[in-house]
């Protein structure tokens, strides 16, 4: 049996999304969901309708791939061991496909985070800076980079790790508020 914190495979998310008639990729769906949850938004079955801005979209059925995606993402964000992972491209995807999925994920994350905008005013200075950095990534395109597999693979992995940690920091800001420097006098 799969761990409740294990994200479903990209292909399974894509297939179920298509079966439901959704025109969204797995990275977009996970990015939007992650943004919504990181910002303290919807905590229930209406998450899909909320991120798609379509009240007519039914909640994913219990035990479905999309319901497992929601449960795993929520669990990962709350994990004290920082288990949060990005759902991007399948293993073996080209560097360009992986980069495109990351930029797509970032665009969707910002949209989902914006839906939970009530927490925006409580972000730390680092949180504000991270949002600006994520916005730059969201505007990026694979055409902006030299897609030399050997040279750029490590760089893309570093950017993915930055995004992963950025999401956790933003979630922390929204969950407990920014940490203000303490004065000792």
From Swiss-Prot:
One GO cellular component term noted in the UniProt record for this chain:
cytosol
Alphabetical list of InterPro entries matching this protein: YgfB-like, YgfB-like_sf
Task: Provide the family line.
Answer: Belongs to the UPF0149 family.
The protein here is known as UPF0149 protein PD_0802
Report which superkingdom the organism of origin falls in: Bacteria
| Gene3D superfamilies, alphabetized | YgfB uncharacterised protein family UPF0149, PF03695
- What's the source species' lineage? Bacteria, Pseudomonadati, Pseudomonadota, Gammaproteobacteria, Lysobacterales
């Amino acid at each position: 049996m799969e761990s409740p914190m294990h994200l479903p495979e990209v292909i399974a998310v894509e297939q179920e999304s298509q079966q439901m008639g959704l025109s969204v990729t797995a990275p977009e769906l996970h990015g939007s969901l992650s943004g919504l949850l990181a910002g303290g938004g919807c905590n229930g079955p209406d998450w899909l309708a909320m991120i798609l801005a379509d009240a007519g979209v039914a909640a994913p059925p219990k035990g479905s791939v999309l319901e497992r995606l929601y449960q795993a993402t929520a669990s990962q964000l709350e994990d004290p061991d920082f288990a949060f992972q990005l759902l991007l491209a399948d293993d073996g995807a080209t560097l360009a496909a992986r980069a495109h999925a990351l930029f797509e994920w970032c665009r969707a994350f910002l949209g989902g985070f914006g839906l939970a905008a009530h927490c925006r005013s409580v972000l730390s200075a680092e949180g504000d800076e991270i949002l600006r950095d994520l916005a730059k990534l969201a505007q990026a395109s694979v055409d902006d980079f030299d897609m030399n597999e050997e040279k750029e693979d490590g760089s893309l992995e570093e950017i993915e790790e930055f995004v992963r940690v950025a999401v956790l920091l933003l979630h922390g800001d929204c969950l407990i508020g920014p940490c203000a420097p303490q004065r000792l006098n």
